[in-house]
Amino acid sequence: MDTSGRKGSDMNIFSLFTLCGGLAFFLYGMTVMSKSLEKMAGGKLERLLKRMTSNPIKSLLLGAGITIAIQSSSAMTVMLVGLVNSGVMELGQTIGVIMGSNIGTTVTAWILSLSGITSDNVFVQLLKPESFSPIVALIGIILIMFTKSSKKKDIGSVCVGFAILMTGMTMMSGAVKPLADLPQFKEVLTILDNPIIAILVGAGITALIQSSAASLGILQSLAMTGSISFSMALPVIMGQNIGTCITALLS
């Protein structure tokens, strides 16, 4: 009795479960981190936006800076929608901030891309988020459990959120490797050769999970295994930027 096919099928199912679990960790970590950062900032971000959006360059830099700080362009967009609806800001003032926010959100992608670094050099290995995320998690847990200051507890939550996020990214990358060798999986990915379909897939997944960073994390996991080429990934990224607009529409 040949059990190799059945064993391979079971492994593929477990890889799919791991991919979904990794995505859940990623989304939860991103949520914990961004909400803790927003809580630390309090109402300062709104006041800062009111004061510094008269100059387009300042607006651009402010949008990029705040998005890098809170690690969520969606949260930034929702904040701007609230300020415009309340009449505090005009629509024209938000253009520079949104452009800056789109620049700032790429920092998340750069951090995630460090997972793909391959080198025997110890210092290069230390740049990989999974190398230092356990230490970051430990620092975060110590701050949460053994400090009384709410600000320090929030910093601890940011650290733990980052560690959970990177754990999810590592899980997704590990799950994609066995799936990449599966003929059926490769066949599904061939639909991305069509740019229109690739844009729709990127927009659909991002709108569904409400996070362009998580959607990009999945894409980077596929790229690390060589499952998709740059030409296939580019329209998906365009779709992801369209899909992330759903947050603004819902708000």
Labelled PLM ranges:
Residues G29, Q71, I103, G168, ...:
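Residue-level signature of catalytic and energy-coupling elements of molecular machines
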Residues M79-I98, A109-S131, T206-G243, S251:
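Membrane-interfacial helix-loop connectors
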Residues N12-P56, I155-G204, S221-A223:
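Helix-loop-helix hairpins and the membrane-proximal interhelical loops
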Residues F25, E38, S74-V78, G104-L112, ...:
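Alpha-helical transmembrane segments and their lipid-water interface positions
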Residues G43, R51, N55, G63, ...:
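Alpha-helical transmembrane segments of multi-pass membrane proteins, especially transporters
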Residues M1-D10:
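Short, Lys/Arg-enriched N-terminal segments with co-localized hydrophobic residues
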Residues N85, T118, I139-D154, S251:
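Membrane-water interface regions at transmembrane-helix termini and the short interhelical loops
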Residues S34-E38, I66-A75, G174-K177, I205-A214, ...:
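Short helix-coil transition sites and intra-membrane helix breaks within transmembrane domains
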